[in-house]
Amino acid sequence: DYPPDVDEFEISGLTPLPSEKVKAPRVAESKVSFECKLNQIVEIGDDSPGAGFLVIGTIVIFHIDDDVYRDGKIDIKTLKPLGRLAGNSYTRISEIFDIVRKVRPD
């Protein structure tokens, strides 16, 4: 957590890339990025561990690198996405499987 006057791109070594629809820059190294309009911030909990904020937004445009886009879909095996857990913990997708969703009868 840095104060607002600190350039977190500089700290992280990532490259800022101008967005098309919003003021905030996006991360050039990211293969998939979303530009969003803020709808609501919901505070969850207090100052105790596990507290935080739920940020709700509307995607106004998304960017997908051609390297990970195949047959009209994002190729998860090529993308190799990371997920953020809690604290300093992250995860990788290690197994992909499909479950056919049942269609509700009319």
Where are these regions (language model features)?
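Active-site-proximal mixed secondary-structure blocks
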Residues: 1-106
